[in-house]
């Protein structure tokens, strides 16, 4: 699933082609995504795109009339192509631009979303209760320590909770906990302040590094130019269950936590 770095890489890739460009058409070939594409989404036709932003794993395409909200789901991708480019399987939506280009949404598994919001997007049900962005000053050690106080859930599940902090999915939660030396099953409310400070720092550092590397390509993700990301080459634990720890040489353990694969080193991340 594309996580925050992959969505941010996509935003950076498509923004120069979208901002200040007029939308001439919205072609919906298959509206049956995670939620049906609403007819009202076509209100973007004739509008000039003012900005392209990211909130968590959502892309926000702003116009004077409203905002298109895009979620890549499990396997979605956005590419900028000449509008005349032949359609391939799973190319569900084209946002056609006056420049002759199109923003094409491809989603094999159809867990993505393409929605429209006329309200300030902060009021939209999908966005209104999201936690802070991890790469901003709002996500800091005192905040996280307070957010986790008295929580008995595993720290990894809390780190992946969008109400606590947005965009830290399974890949980067595994990596950040390893870097901070915290066992993923540790009770969140019992992790001490020193470890929380290290964890916040590692989350920021790992996400920033992943963005710089173009995201993580494991199977489906490509950027707006169709190129893969290279952060997978730097993964220490995710997807490496049963292999040796890059830090101590011990075999990495793999368990299911919240139905997600969780890999850790039982020596470097003691419970």
Curated annotation (Swiss-Prot):
| GO MF, one example | damaged DNA binding
Binding note for cofactor:
Binds 1 zinc ion per subunit.
State the superkingdom: Bacteria
Among CDD domains, the record links this protein to:
EcFpg-like_N
Name the cofactor(s): Zn(2+)
Output the GO biological process annotations, alphabetical, semicolon-separated.
base-excision repair
Q: Which UniProt keywords apply?
A: DNA damage, DNA repair, DNA-binding, Glycosidase, Hydrolase, Lyase, Metal-binding, Multifunctional enzyme, Zinc, Zinc-finger
The active site annotation covers 2-3, 57, 260
For this protein, the record's Pfam families field holds:
Fapy_DNA_glyco (PF01149), H2TH (PF06831), zf-FPG_IleRS (PF06827)
EC numbers listed for it are 3.2.2.23, 4.2.99.18
Q: How does it assemble?
A: Monomer.
User: Per its UniProt record, what HAMAP family does this chain match?
Assistant: Fapy_DNA_glycosyl
**Name of this chain's protein:** Formamidopyrimidine-DNA glycosylase
Give the species: Shewanella halifaxensis (strain HAW-EB4)
Q: What is the gene name?
A: mutM
